[in-house]
Amino acid sequence: YRKDARDPKYNTRLTINSAKGAAMMLRRSAIDRVGTFDEDFFIYFEETDLCHKLWLAGYKVIYEPLSVVYHYEAVDTHKQMRNSFIMYLSYRNRIASYLKNLSVPSILRLFPVLCLFYFFSCALYPTAVLRALVWNIWMFPKTMNKRRLVQRGRKLDDTTLFQTIWRDPPLIYYYYLFKSLKFYRHEPSLVETNHY
């Protein structure tokens, strides 16, 4: 996203957690199965939510370096909206997505981390955090209906999913991201673990 496509780190096919909505292609069968973007999200975290549902339904999300995307028009939302509104949408949608997509044990494990995250976020965007929490309380029945649909179609458990998206790209990718990436593709552990 907004980087030089000729950079070596972008020339490796990778299984990824989420694709950008403006540069995403989906199988029709996947759309028929999991649906499209959540209509209640408006913007922010909508493609991550969709990709999470795809993973749970048994699909993979893959970054393909040979693809070419022409993004005809873009709007800088930071110029169009106040930061507090942007953060509100981001917090709001993130909470709703976790409630819909994560298993109950994963939600319980993540809950203390989220509480800490939102506690510190309150220092910067108190209104945004409060509005996000109120919205999710108000929308809780609707979110639970969506959750039932997602969980009914689940084919992948959270443990397997997290191992996949944390392993691929593997940790060494991030090492090369901050160091020299020219040898990344020749890393033996990557060649052995990436099977597409």
Segments (PLM) and residue ranges:
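Short glycine/proline- and charge-enriched loop/turn segments
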Residues: 7-10, 35, 70-80
